[in-house]
Design a protein with these regions (language model features):
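Electrostatic, structured charged patches in enzyme active sites and in nucleic-acid/phosphate-binding
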Residues: 1-102
């Protein structure tokens, strides 16, 4: 097993400002899967509230607009990470407190 933290850099285009930025995923791991094969994965750990699009709750507030912007940036990062992984035959996962059991 191999474990690295925030060592991979993935470029992504931000929908908020239309500029290119660098995304540093939380973890890169190499593990042996159930079939005994070595598998590479990029893992991002986020609160569940940041891993789903925000819901409109009545009046549009500044907080809601911040949540929409954060969701847009996260979605752009994750799409870039999925492409990065696809090109290398790796897997990309967003992990929340649900998967961690907390």
């Amino acid at each position: 097993m191999l474990f690295r933290s925030e060592e991979i850099i993935i470029p992504y285009l931000s929908p908020v400002d239309g500029r290119w930025h660098r995304y540093f995923p939380d973890f890169y791991v190499k593990v042996r899967n159930r079939q005994g094969l070595i598998e590479s994965r990029i893992l991002e750990v986020k609160p569940k509230s940041q891993s789903v699009p925000p819901k409109v709750r009545g009046k549009v507030t500044r907080q809601y607009l911040k949540e929409v912007a954060a969701w847009g940036v996260n979605e752009a990062k994750w799409k870039a990470a999925e492409e990065y992984c696809k090109d290398r035959n790796w897997k990309f996962n967003v992990i929340t407190e649900e998967q961690l059991g907390i």
